[in-house]
Amino acid sequence: MKFSAALVVAAMGAAPAAGLPTDINGDLPPRMYSNLSGLQSKYARGIMAQAKREHLGSQGCRAGIATALVESTLIMHANMAVPASLAYDFDRLGKDADSIGLFQQRASIYTNIKCSMDVACSAHQFFKEMKTVPQWKYMPVGKLCQEVQHSENPERYDEFINQATEICQAAGF
């Protein structure tokens, strides 16, 4: 199993965010967000940077962060059922069907495994689907997450809206 540098740093007790690369984070500086570990904060920055690149505003940011919190706890998941996912950096093995990455995107639907295992690319996949939802800019964020993900537990998204809002606001959304 591969571990990211952030997880190793966190396990050693150092301040993980300070040593993280910022290339996936656009113009967002390394920092910790609302009850997130350094590793989770790194992934949150990647999602938020993609939301900024796509000009999705607070609504897009909150939907992306809330979804990743629910689906993966903002931890990169590979899956033994998707052997190709094991070739990329991951932090945890998942076992939900053929779901991988931060958004638990189904490999049978999102066939570019490399993309699903990459923070910016997987966020783009999520946002691309999100933008097809009619009136996505105006609906409640939890409902928007459900419209994109089609979860068996749609109520879970609402549980993370406040945290997602705090994280996005701290990043300037």
Positions of PLM-derived features:
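Extracytoplasmic/secreted envelope proteins and their assembly/folding machinery
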Residues: S41-M48, C61-G64, L102, A120-F127, ...
